[in-house]
């Protein structure tokens, strides 16, 4: 029954992610069409800074996930969780108001507006994250998927309205980054309201006294803080190149650079559902079972991303047809797309294993070292070449370094197998660069990359594929129901 439940959970979350993917595709291509480059650049600056707001939950949501992962929702103490919810609402509201006041008092121009909106967003986004982590911890993946779908459908409707306005009134004052951000935040507030109603049993009503639970709240913060810092440092590694381009180049150059990552996010939206389901499932496994899963999980993610890289070809045509003023973004996209195979392994598989092994402090150190390396690599790239593309290549080098030091600790201490997956990933990275750069005929380029992908995949993962097929036969014959 466990295997079938896991498959169902992955399907439910993946369906929500597919709907989110559709929304990301629409946003990714329509928003830069209806906003001018300057406004799009300001919008992407906003999205860059909201990626840091997770620091301001101070580990509370991660502590909730770590302490309650694997439990059933009915096992949660209602009165205690009502206190946790009230505490977190107050905490985030205080920092949100402080952020808005600071932006108004100390900043000027467009950055004042952007940072004030970032500060407001931290309230909605962190509270939504709190409820999402409760869904994830208690394996209530239906609510998690519904949340994704509501947000995606609402965002699609918003973009559709703006597209209609753009077609009818191309110079409308509504076609600005500020209007879109405010409208998006209204959607977030509505989504938060839905969560309050859905989880009303742990939100409203009689609650435990703070004095009785202050030690538990401190434990939640203590448990989650290191994980949060590790996660945010890892996020800094991921966005280091964008931060450099944002700081060192004009807003239009940054808009084109950020657009490349906007396209990339369409792919990541589809595969992140696996990590959502994985943590509570792995936490229920024995140590040996989890360690055996590691190389298979790494292989699954890498193969999926490598096949997804075939999307580079149609995406290139769509951009050239629909958004020719973003044609420069395609070179950045071509450089960073293969890096996704390595970053996905780190953020989806490796990070999950550090969590279940309770080695968040080690992962923090790994990410801190990687962050320093990434910073130095970007500095060197800019000092020598002074181009956004050189910073993209520096991002590839720093990601390889990050991958190696993060898996070497697991290999040394837990004997996980990783070398085959790394060799596979690097082979496909090289294959992608070679086929997209040196083969001018697109049909031959696609065929060559696909042939290399299939041959290397079968050569390295033939045994793993056979095991997957065998397990599926067992499930279809009913053996999976008895496990």
Task: List each language-model region with its residue ranges.
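Helix-loop junctions and terminal segments of transmembrane helices
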Residues: 57-73, 260, 264-288, 295-298, ...
């Amino acid at each position: 029954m466990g295997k079938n439940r896991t498959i169902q959970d992955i399907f439910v979350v993946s369906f929500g992610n597919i709907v989110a993917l559709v929304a990301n595709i629409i946003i990714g291509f329509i928003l830069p069409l209806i906003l001018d480059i300057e406004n799009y650049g300001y919008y992407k600056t906003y999205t860059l800074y909201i990626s840091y707001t997770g620091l301001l939950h101070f580990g509370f949501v991660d502590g909730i996930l770590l302490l309650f992962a694997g439990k059933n929702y009915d096992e949660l103490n209602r009165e205690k969780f009502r206190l946790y919810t009230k505490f977190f609402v107050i905490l985030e509201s205080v920092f949100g108001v402080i952020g808005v006041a600071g932006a108004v008092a100390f900043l000027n121009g467009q950055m004042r507006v952007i940072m004030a909106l970032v500060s407001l967003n931290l309230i909605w986004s962190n509270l939504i994250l709190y409820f999402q982590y409760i869904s994830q911890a208690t394996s209530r993946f239906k609510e998690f998927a519904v949340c994704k779908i509501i947000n995606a459908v609402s965002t699609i409707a918003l973009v559709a309205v703006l597209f209609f306005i753009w077609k009818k009134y191309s110079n409308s004052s509504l076609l600005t980054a500020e209007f879109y951000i405010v409208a998006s935040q209204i959607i977030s507030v509505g989504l938060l309201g839905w969560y309050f109603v859905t989880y009303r049993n742990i939100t409203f009503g009689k609650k435990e006294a703070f004095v009785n639970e202050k030690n538990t709240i401190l434990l939640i913060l203590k448990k989650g803080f290191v994980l949060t810092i590790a996660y945010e440092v890892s996020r800094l590694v991921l966005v280091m190149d964008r931060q450099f381009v944002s700081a060192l180049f004009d807003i239009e150059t940054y808009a084109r650079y950020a657009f490349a990552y906007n396209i990339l996010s369409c792919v990541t939206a589809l595969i992140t559902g696996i990590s959502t389901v994985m943590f509570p499932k792995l936490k229920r496994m024995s140590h040996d079972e989890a360690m055996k899963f590691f190389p298979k999980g790494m292989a699954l993610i890498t193969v999926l991303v490598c096949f997804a890289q075939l999307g580079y070809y149609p995406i290139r045509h769509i951009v050239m047809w629909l958004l020719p003023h973003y044609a420069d973004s395609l070179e950045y996209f071509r450089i960073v797309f293969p890096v996704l195979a390595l970053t996905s392994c780190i953020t989806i598989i490796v990070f999950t294993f550090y969590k279940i092994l309770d080695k968040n402090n080690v992962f923090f150190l790994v990410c801190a070292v990687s962050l320093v390396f990434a910073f130095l690599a970007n500095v060197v790239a800019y000092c020598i070449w002074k181009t956004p593309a050189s910073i993209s290549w520096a991002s590839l080098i720093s990601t390889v370094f990050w991958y190696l030091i993060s898996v070497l600790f697991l290999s040394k201490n837990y004997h996980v197998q990783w070398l085959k997956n790394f060799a596979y990933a690097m082979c496909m990275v090289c294959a992608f660069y070679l086929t997209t750069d040196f083969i001018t005929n697109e049909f031959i380029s696609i065929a060559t990359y696909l042939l290399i992908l299939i041959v290397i995949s079968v050569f390295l993962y033939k045994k793993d594929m056979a095991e997957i097929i065998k397990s599926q036969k067992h499930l279809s014959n009913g053996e999976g129901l008895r496990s």
